[in-house]
Every structure is written in C-alpha cells, then in structure tokens.
Amino acid sequence: GLAPSIMNGSDALITDDSAFSAKFYVATSQLMAVNLGDHISGVFWAAFLLFSWTAASIVSGAVIERITTFAFGILAIAIGSVFWTIDAAWGWHFDGWMLKLLGYHDAYASGVIHAIAGGFALGILVVLGPRIGKFTSSGEPRNIGPRNPWLVTIGLFLIYTGFWGFYAACNIPIFNLGPEYGMEGVTYFTATNIYVTPTTLSGITFNFLMSLSGGLLAGYVVSRGDPFWTYSSGLAGVICASAGNDLYHPIQSMIIGMIGVVIAYRMHYWVERKFKIDDAVGAVAVHGYAGFVGLVICGFVLNGYPSSGYSVGAMWDGSTYASINPLG
C-alpha cells in the first residue's frame, strides 16, 4: 500500500505538504480498504504493486551472482517501495510539480520506472564490483554469454507481451464525458492515459509495435546478429520511446527506438571497459541508458506540447501546465 499512498494525487504524502494528508493512509481509511464507493482504486493498487516488482526485477538481473538474498531483499524494498514511487508522485501524476513547473512528460514510464531502476542498479554495481572471471589480468572484459539462448528468447517475448499489457492498462476508458465537457445528453466514448490526455488503444499499440520493431532492427545491426542483444534491444526500443508514445507519430516511435538502442549498446560496452562495470544482463543499458535517452528525446521532439491535459471544463488545453521542453 505504500506506492499508492506516496503518489496518489494532491492528497498524497509526497505531493501534498498538508499535515492532514496522512489521515487518508491509515489502515481504516477508504483508500486502504474495500468500500462500496470504490470503483478503480483496487486496480491501481495492483498496478502500482506490479510496477514495484518491475523496478526490483530490473535490479535483480544486473546484480546476479554477487549478492545475498537478504541484501537484495533490502534493496528491492528500497527501490520498489520508496524511490520509484517518489519519482512517480512528482512526474507521473497530472498534479505532480514536475509536470506543472518543469514540463516533464513520461507517459509510459521511460524514466519513473526504467531509468530510475537502471540508475539504482548502476550504483549497486559500482559497489559490488565485477563477477569473478569477468575481466582478464590485463583488464579486458570477457563475454559471458547466456546459459540458454532459448530461455532468453522466451523470456523477452513474455516481457514484450507484458509491456504491451501495461500500455493497454494505462489506456483508461471514459464513457459519457458529461456536461462539463459540452457533451450533455450525448454518450461519447474516449480514453485517456495517466496524464488525462486523449489516447486510443490502436494508436498506442501501433506506436508500441513500431518502437519494438525499430529496437529489434537496430539491435540486430549494431550487435551483428547477436541473439541476446537483438531481443534485448527490442525492449530497449520500447523503453526509449515510451516517454512520448502517447503523442509520437509511429515513424517517430520507430526512429527514436532505434536511436535509443544504438546509444544504450555503445554505452554498455564503453562503461564496461572504462569503469569495469559488470552489468550481467544489460539491465543498466536496456533500462537505464535507454530510458534516460528517451526522456531527453521526448523533450526535444514534443517541445511546446502541454505536459498534461487535465483541465475540468476544457479537457485537453494544458493551460495550467508547463510545456514539454528539453530541460523538463
């Protein structure tokens, strides 16, 4: 329950400085228990729990073979229950100060989950050091490939499917917009995302597939057909484009996914050689580097768009929000 408690709107522990906000998160409050007036909180609670698991699982891949279960459990609680939720409260809610003041935009979690978890993993790797045998006596890195390429393939295709499910879950349907939107007496269907901007399931699916395709293509080229990096790059392409995939043109999604993969791949091996960082499954590259690059690209490509569209009575006018910009 900590994740929704931290990032749930203007009454959240992080986004609200009121001393009375804590009353909403005691065990007897409506937000923390089932009640007849609750239609969606349980769904979001489960979703935020899943995101917490995701953040912890990203870290787990990077640190394999060098950490005890107890130590990893502590780190999983830190990243899964605290750090990513603070960032989400600030930049992944339409009432967050990063949206209103800085023009931050991250529709499908390039930064609030992937870049944060990748950066967290990088910090741990600096402390842990490399696996035994990863580097030669002269300091040259050895390539320790996956034990079973078939399991790598199956696992990454399952991740693709789950990621698309996350996209679809973020596409929240709205029926009968009501008189406040000038739709009185009219049953009108639309959908929105976490920033309350209009989206369609077909649009975000197309962008998802285009960024996935761009990532796979770029990964195949830069890795010269290496199966591990080809499939991992498909995920990196989606992560890179996810920050703005609610507003990108499909061709933009594909190109941005390709750019993110090239940068993540090159950065992985440069950091490995320069700083002797042993990122076992490429988690820092695929999630951290690609996610951060995606945020920067989003600021340039969507420069001038409202960071969020929520405005009662006007729907998507963005009048109370800073525009998306490269520095946001």
What are these regions (language model features)?
Residues 1-328:
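Glycine- and aromatic-enriched membrane alpha-helices
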